[in-house]
Design a protein with these regions (language model features):
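Primarily a LysM-type cell-wall glycan-binding module
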Residues: 3-4, 37-66
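Second-shell loop/turn segments in exported
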Residues: 12, 47-51, 57-61, 120-123, ...
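Extracellular LysM carbohydrate-binding repeats and other cell-envelope/extracellular binding modules
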Residues: 12-45, 69-101, 224-225
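Loop/turn positions that initiate beta-strands
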Residues: 55, 86-89, 218-219
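Gly/Pro-biased beta-strand-loop elements
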Residues: 93-187
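N-terminal targeting pre-sequences for secretion and organelle import
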Residues: 207-225
């Protein structure tokens, strides 16, 4: 229960303190604690006990709870996709949302309005990353990169700039349509925390791999100046 207690104390600090240092430390600690809880069978208020039914698959359970197969598997330490009726799983039932600040070059992951973790990101040079409300559409592991001239650069090619994961985003709710934008990894870690990309949101590969496990397609992404 000590992780849960530490988590509660950190949320109290965030709710009560206006001190930037205290808030930053609480956020850092929460990022670590939340990942520890999400990626293990440890209980948390945002998880539900679920008994596997006849005919269930991880994909079906993931759709039912609007989560990802990866998170169910990792959170229950499953060695394979094979599940049997009567197996008990702890399944995350919260709704993730992503908020990207262009000025701050950071990305905040929340669940049901609660802070989960803050990541450093790189955004578009000259303010090229569009602001507005989006949702994640496609999620691709080891993505190929479509160069601006239309040539496809396969994953593993030195010229492919997308890193290890790609999540495309589409505009919703009156945000102007902007094609070709997304959240991806990078091979150039020194560009994180800067406005250096062609407009996409880039993350350290380890960070985008973590986020990729957590957020399903349909997750809202809000980008602010």
């Amino acid at each position: 229960g000590s992780l849960a207690e530490a988590r509660s104390k950190c949320y109290e600090a965030l709710a009560q303190s206006g001190d930037a240092v205290v808030r930053s430390e609480a956020e850092s600690l929460l990022g670590l604690i939340n990942m520890e809880l999400l990626f293990s069978p440890a209980p948390m208020p945002e998880k539900e006990e679920y008994a596997v039914q006849a005919g269930d698959s991880l994909d079906r359970i993931a759709r039912k709870f609007k989560t990802t197969v990866d998170l169910i598997a990792k959170g229950n330490l499953l060695k394979s996709d094979v599940i049997r009726p009567g197996d008990r799983l702890r399944v995350f039932k919260g709704v993730f949302a992503i908020a990207v600040s262009k000025a701050g070059n950071d990305l905040v992951l929340s669940a049901d309005g609660k802070f989960i973790k803050r990541y450093r990101v790189g955004t578009g040079q000259f303010g090229k990353t569009p602001a507005g409300t989006f949702v994640i559409v496609d999620k691709i592991v080891d993505p190929p990169w479509w160069r601006p001239d239309g040539k496809v650069i396969p994953f593993g090619d030195k010229e492919n700039v997308l890193g290890t994961r790609w999540m495309s985003i589409a505009a919703v709710e009156g945000t102007e349509h902007a094609a070709g934008y997304g959240i991806h990894g990078t091979w150039e870690d020194d560009t994180i925390g800067k406005q250096a990309s062609a407009g996409c949101i880039r993350m350290h590969n380890a960070d985008v791999e973590e986020l990729f496990i957590l957020v399903p397609a349909g997750t809202r992404v809000t980008i602010t100046e």
